Amino acid sequence: MAAARGLSLTAATQKAVTPWPRGRLLAASLGPQARREASSSSPEAGEGQIRLTDSCVQRLLEITEGSEFLRLQVEGGGCSGFQYKFSLDTVINPDDRVFEQGGARVVVDSDSLAFVKGAQVDFSQELIRSSFQVLNNPQAQQGCSCGSSFSIKL
């Protein structure tokens, strides 16, 4: 889907991703330029930002208490190379970016932000499961049918 929109990673981020010799991406780290780019503030909603859907905001307001927030991380793994990990947390680290909307907060570390910037966090409630999901990720080339794993554009 995202490939059809012609969106891609920046050159700095592309250089920072190192594929495993067999071609599967297992992990990545960002260089100084890519880290600055991932953590820089931008007024445009799509550039370096994470958008929250109304259903995400509503669900977070229901389940969080006090200083709790939703943490979004990207880890190596899953059937497509990378996977999204959601958890409730109360500690904001120095390299974290906080995205707040309507009193609900989603926090993303700078390494993970490079893989999800411009994406949207949603809460989906279906007959068989309810979950937070990352939608419309411009950094993802393809994802698996479960929606929790993806590969990045190189």
Curated annotation (Swiss-Prot):
Keywords: Iron, Iron-sulfur, Metal-binding, Mitochondrion, Transit peptide. Its main location: mitochondrion. Fe cation binds at C79, C144, C146. It comes from the Eukaryota. Pfam families: Fe-S_biosyn. Residues 1-8 form a transit peptide. PROSITE patterns: HESB (PS01152). One of its GO terms (molecular function) is 4 iron, 4 sulfur cluster binding. The keyword Transit peptide applies. Belongs to the HesB/IscA family. This is Iron-sulfur cluster assembly 2 homolog, mitochondrial. It comes from Pongo abelii. The gene is ISCA2.
